[in-house]
């Protein structure tokens, strides 16, 4: 069974979102997603300062098995990326909810966060 922390929100496309301060949200891929992809070899992240729409492709995770698009769960401006993934993409596998985070986004509408899936909703989506 995948690790699905209850304090996070999720998307059906396997991104997780953590609320931080001042309308900023941290985004990564779920434990389920990283386990399906296998060992990460490269992560292509969005540009800091870029504006991303909800559901837009904004990053790519490349593993030994496949390359997978990552979609923004919220609309907003990219305010930070996890630059350590350039040298150590395996952090996405080892700690997808901590050191393996991908980017931080300042949401245009922080209320979008409430509409994302709860841990229970995400687990139910996995079972479908």
Curated annotation (Swiss-Prot):
A GO biological process of this protein is: glycine decarboxylation via glycine cleavage system
* Textual note on the cofactor: Binds 1 lipoyl cofactor covalently.
Which cofactors does it use? (R)-lipoate
Listed A to Z, the keywords are: Lipoyl
Checking InterPro entries in the record gives: 2-oxoA_DH_lipoyl-BS (IPR003016), Biotin_lipoyl (IPR000089), GCV_H (IPR002930), GCV_H/Fam206 (IPR033753), GCV_H_sub (IPR017453), Single_hybrid_motif (IPR011053)
PROSITE patterns registered for this protein in UniProt: BIOTINYL_LIPOYL (PS50968), LIPOYL (PS00189)
Q: Which residues carry this modification: N6-lipoyllysine?
A: 65
Domain Lipoyl-binding, residue spans: 24-106
Could you name the Gene Ontology cellular component terms for this entry?
A: cytosol; glycine cleavage complex
Entry's family note: Belongs to the GcvH family.
What is the role of this chain? The glycine cleavage system catalyzes the degradation of glycine. The H protein shuttles the methylamine group of glycine from the P protein to the T protein.
Subunit details for this protein? Answer: The glycine cleavage system is composed of four proteins: P, T, L and H.
What is this protein's record name? Glycine cleavage system H protein
Corresponding gene?
gcvH
């Amino acid at each position: 069974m995948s690790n699905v922390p209850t304090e996070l929100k999720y998307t059906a496309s396997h991104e997780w979102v953590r609320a931080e301060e001042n309308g900023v949200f941290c985004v990564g891929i779920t434990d389920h997603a990283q386990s399906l992809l296998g060992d990460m070899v490269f992560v292509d992240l969005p540009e800091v300062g870029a504006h991303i729409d909800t559901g837009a492709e904004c990053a790519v995770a490349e593993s030994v098995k496949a390359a997978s698009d990552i979609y923004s769960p919220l609309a907003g401006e990219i305010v930070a990326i996890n630059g350590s993934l350039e040298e150590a993409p395996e952090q996405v596998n080892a700690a997808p909810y901590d050191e393996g985070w991908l980017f931080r986004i300042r949401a245009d509408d922080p209320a979008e966060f409430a509409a994302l899936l709860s841990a229970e909703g995400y687990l139910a989506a996995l079972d479908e």
